């Protein structure tokens, strides 16, 4: 059981972040934000995939001016990602549910003061998003692109916002490699109680991003660290959500959806187990009940796994068993097994 660190709770739109709230999953569109149609379409795809909070890039004035039209067409909380030009943050703050600023490139303290004032007036939070690749010069010169440098930047900017009377804050500390990222979050966690946004930046394409994020975010989640998260995958909207949800579930940080146990296959199996598992995954994505299910290709491990599973299939030659709580409920031909299995899953899910 994960002993999650209790943090201050803030709200991004209607989504609670921190405190006792579930760890939320975020993503980011890759369309030009000024292209309202494409951006809204991507946000709706993310919403359907299970995203909780969505972020959009705001590099130009035309992007900032498009935010209102986007916000009117979506129901997910909207975060504006601001670099370099604080004036874009002032415009965005009139519309969005959260502002993300990068203290390494947003400009002078006077500019940050104006952003804070705009967020205070609308009662929206600020994410202090520290990146190893864009640290302020003073921290870069002293620490280099290190975990220590990221933590020093975060602490400095947290204090600056606090001195302005602003504490509606969440924090991220991202590097492109796992070790620096994990070390930074671990170093900063004991020093404040603000919610943490987890992520490994520039993680890469699907395979590499999944590996990096699973190691980095999984390690932090097992430490009880993290209140919201994004898995960054180059050009893969829905997969960001799928991987993030899987990391949350398999780390034990979230208790929703099926935990599917399936054998790795070997010479003993006499059924198309790969296709069966794939079909089960597709047909049960809507299930939120925290059920443990087992799909095994032969009797060697099937009975033992079934004893610990809510629902199980044990394949044999042309036939197989469906079991519920370790008891056989059906002995069927192979082509009937998945249908009956899904029926049992849906039946049990309704009881939760």
Swiss-Prot record:
SUPFAM superfamilies: Dihydropteroate synthetase-like, Nitrite and sulphite reductase 4Fe-4S domain-like. Converts 2C-methyl-D-erythritol 2,4-cyclodiphosphate (ME-2,4cPP) into 1-hydroxy-2-methyl-2-(E)-butenyl 4-diphosphate. GO terms for molecular function: 4 iron, 4 sulfur cluster binding; 4-hydroxy-3-methylbut-2-en-1-yl diphosphate synthase activity (ferredoxin); 4-hydroxy-3-methylbut-2-enyl-diphosphate synthase activity (flavodoxin); iron ion binding. This is 4-hydroxy-3-methylbut-2-en-1-yl diphosphate synthase (flavodoxin). Its cofactor is [4Fe-4S] cluster. It comes from Sulfurimonas denitrificans (strain ATCC 33889 / DSM 1251) (Thiomicrospira denitrificans (strain ATCC 33889 / DSM 1251)). InterPro entries: Dihydropteroate_synth-like_sf (IPR011005), IspG_bac (IPR016425), IspG_bac-typ (IPR004588), NO2/SO3_Rdtase_4Fe4S_sf (IPR045854). NCBIfam families: ispG_gcpE (TIGR00612), PRK00366.1 (NF001540). Keywords: 4Fe-4S, Iron, Iron-sulfur, Isoprene biosynthesis, Metal-binding, Oxidoreductase. GO terms for biological process: isopentenyl diphosphate biosynthetic process, methylerythritol 4-phosphate pathway; terpenoid biosynthetic process. Binds 1 [4Fe-4S] cluster. Belongs to the IspG family.
């Amino acid at each position: 059981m994960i002993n999650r660190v209790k943090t201050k709770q803030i709200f991004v739109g209607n989504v609670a972040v921190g405190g006792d709230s579930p760890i939320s999953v975020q993503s980011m569109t890759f369309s030009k934000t000024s292209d309202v149609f494409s951006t809204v379409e991507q946000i709706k795809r993310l919403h359907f995939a299970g995203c909780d909070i969505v972020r959009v890039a705001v590099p130009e004035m035309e992007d900032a001016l498009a935010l209102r039209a986007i916000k009117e067409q979506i129901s997910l909380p909207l975060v504006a990602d601001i670099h370099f030009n604080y004036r874009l943050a002032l415009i965005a703050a009139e519309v969005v549910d959260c502002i993300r600023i990068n203290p390494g490139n947003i400009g002078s303290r006077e500019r940050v003061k104006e952003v804070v004032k705009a967020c205070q007036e609308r009662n929206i939070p600020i994410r202090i998003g520290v990146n190893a690749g864009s640290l302020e010069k003073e921290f870069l010169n002293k620490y280099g692109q290190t975990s220590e440098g990221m933590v020093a930047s975060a602490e400095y900017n947290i204090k600056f916002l606090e001195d302005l009377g602003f504490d509606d804050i969440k924090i991220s500390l991202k590097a492109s490699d796992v070790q620096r990222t994990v070390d930074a979050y671990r170093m900063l966690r004991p020093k404040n109680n603000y919610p943490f946004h987890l992520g490994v930046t520039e993680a890469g394409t699907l395979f590499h991003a999944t590996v990096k994020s699973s190691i980095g975010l999984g390690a932090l989640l097992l430490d009880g660290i993290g209140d919201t998260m994004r898995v960054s995958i180059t050009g893969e909207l829905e997969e960001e959500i799928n991987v993030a949800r899987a990391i949350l579930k398999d780390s034990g940080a979230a208790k929703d959806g099926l935990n599917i146990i399936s054998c790795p296959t070997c010479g003993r199996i006499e059924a198309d187990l790969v296709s069966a598992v794939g079909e089960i995954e597709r047909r049960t994505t809507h299930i939120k009940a925290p059920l443990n299910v087992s799909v095994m290709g032969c009797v060697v491990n099937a009975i033992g796994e079934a004893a610990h599973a809510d629902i199980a299939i044990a394949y044999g030659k042309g036939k197989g068993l469906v079991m519920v709580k370790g008891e056989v409920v059906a002995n069927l031909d192979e082509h009937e097994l998945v249908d009956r299995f899904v029926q049992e899953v849906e039946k049990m899910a309704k009881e939760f």
